[in-house]
Amino acid sequence: MSFFYDGCHNEARLSVIAGPCIFESKEHALDMAGALKEICTSLDVNFIYKTSFDKANRTSSLSYRGVGFDEAYYGMNAVREVLGVEVLTDVHEAWQCGSVAADILQIPAFLCRQTDLLKAAAETGKPVNVKKGQFLSPKEMVNIVAKLESFGCNKVMQTERGTTFGYNNLVVDMRSLELMRANTPANYPVIMDCTHAVQSPGGYGTSSGGDRDMVPAIARAAVAVGVAGVFMEVHQDPDNAPCDGPNMLHLAKFRPVLEKLLEIDYVVKKGV
């Protein structure tokens, strides 16, 4: 059971998925989750902490992958037990689905068509957040959702994270948010990933670049369209983060950005 998922609806007050790109240490996870929880609680925002135990989808073997499954497991579980904060994490192989310390499983964009992975995630009974592949049209997501449903999952989230636009670049078509919602009669929550959307895949050769200054603009546009929630990777020192620093939002900017998004969300949803 996920209280976050139960409170995340397209017509409800904006929900937030936030946290650093990757799990760095138990202490760092508790610090980040605690800071984000404090902000979201003060603003009455439905919040779940995101982190990754392995960055397996990387072009270069020189890219940082993480501390490993076991260490991340105990640290992620500490966030849940010590802080009472739910956790969302991505899975890359079927065996991981039943083993991770997470309340919501996330299917990476590059793996959104992997049937065995979707099946394993669905069979856990946990909500599944599937990211739309950078190579997929929003209308094709109906097939991904149907596949999850066929394996017994009726708690699905769909996340937009941009579409490949030439080399080392992504573009966001805001129409996709409406199309993904319209495609699914169950009205599953639609989420906007505001930080990976400003990524420059492979932009630094052996790692990705990005433009974090564009995160607030992408977020405001998505909330103006109307979404269930936003996904934002946040770090207290993104310039020195192990990975994805160029597109992570600085923790110091998280609250003011979120306050503006809530103002827009209120207008769009007429005071929900």
Descriptions of predicted regions:
Residues 11-15, 43-47, 81-87, 102-103, ...:
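Short, well-ordered coil/turn segments that N-cap beta-strands
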Residues 221-272:
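Structured C-terminal cap/extension of enzyme domains
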Residues 23-36, 67-74, 209-217:
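Glycine-rich anion/phosphate-binding loops
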Residues 125, 129-234:
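Catalytic alpha/beta core domains of metabolic enzymes, predominantly
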Residues 67-68, 82-97, 103-116, 126-138, ...:
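Catalytic beta/alpha-barrel core
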Residues 16, 20-29, 47-69, 234-245:
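Glycine-rich, proline-tolerant flexible connector loops at the mouths of alpha/beta enzymes
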Residues 36-43, 62-88, 120-127, 177-190, ...:
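Alpha-helix-loop-beta-strand connector modules within alpha/beta enzyme cores
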